[in-house]
Design a protein with these regions (language model features):
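Conserved catalytic submotifs in the C-terminal HATPase_c
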Residues: 88, 93-103
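Short conserved segment of the HATPase_c
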Residues: 184-195
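Short alpha-helical Gxxx[C/S/T] motif in the catalytic ATP-binding
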Residues: 207, 211
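Conserved DHp (HisKA) dimerization/phosphotransfer helix of two-component histidine kinases, i.e.
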Residues: 36-86
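Detector for a conserved hydrophobic position within an alpha-helical segment of the HATPase_c
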Residues: 215-216
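Conserved HAMP-HisKA connector
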Residues: 1-9
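Short beta-strand/loop element within the Bergerat-fold HATPase_c
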Residues: 134-171
């Protein structure tokens, strides 16, 4: 029998909610438990489980689309503004270029928004990691172990950038998300779209597999390219979405 992940997730989520409620009741009647070592870890672990269950359900439903007429010029500009506002308190330079005459065509805008914000969020994480590494005078965090003579003057002037570009090419809509962050190690490139594979300190490893699944359900492709970009071994990573125009 085919395993219904959504049903399993629902069955697990119910007792998980009860556990969380019980913890809150214990804290309310016995505030001293907040001082117990690792008590806060319980909340973190439960939140992680809830996130995992939500992403499992989303992954299971990734190929089920609810398409509607979508004006990609308006749609992508809204995403650009939304992301720009989320990083306004950082030093990240966000460069958005939405070319004119993008198509109006059927698409699941809710799921595509999820994909694009996930890719932009990953880019944000990558440049912030790189910025933190540089500000601490450490070796480049770009998986370049051979470079032990990092020019700290360059490290201190590191300028995080994220590029969001959309254009029409022949009969395809192309959207790319690029960053000059910490990059992806060559040995990891072939596995980042596999479920539960993650090279972050946190995360479920379902974000990129779900993103690719959603794009493929639209008849498109999601690819990644990561290569050395600057002399101090910063890497540039680009994720490219290609969606056919009907």
């Amino acid at each position: 029998h085919r395993m219904d992940i959504s049903t399993i997730s629902h069955e697990i989520r119910n007792p998980l909610t009860l556990i969380y409620s019980t913890l809150q009741m214990i804290e309310a009647s016995n505030p001293e438990v907040l001082n117990i070592r690792h008590w806060s870890d319980l909340h973190s672990d439960i939140e992680y489980m809830k996130q995992l269950l939500e992403e499992l359900s989303a992954y299971n439903n990734g190929q089920r689309l609810s398409p509607s007429s979508t004006d990609f010029d308006i749609f992508l500009k809204k995403i650009s503004l939304s992301f720009a506002s989320s990083i306004i308190e950082t030093d990240i330079e966000f460069i958005s270029r939405i070319e004119p005459e993008l198509p109006v065509m059927p698409a699941d805008s809710i799921k595509l928004r999820e994909v694009l914000l996930n890719l932009l969020g990953n880019a944000r994480d990558a440049v912030l990691i790189q910025q933190s590494t540089c500000s601490n005078h450490l070796d480049s965090a770009c998986n370049c172990e051979s470079n032990r003579s990092l020019d700290t003057s360059k490290a201190l002037t590191y300028s995080p950038q994220i590029h969001f570009h959309a254009w029409k090419e022949h009969s395809n809509l192309i959207i790319s998300v690029s960053d000059n962050g910490c990059g992806i190690a060559p040995e990891h490139l072939s596995s980042i779209f596999e479920p539960f594979v993650t090279y972050k300190s946190s995360g479920t490893g379902l974000g990129l597999p779900l993103s690719r699944r959603i794009i493929e359900a639209h008849g498109g492709t999601l690819t990644v390219h990561s290569e050395p970009d600057l002399p101090d071994c910063q890497l540039k990573t680009t994720f490219t979405l290609t969606i056919p125009i009907p």
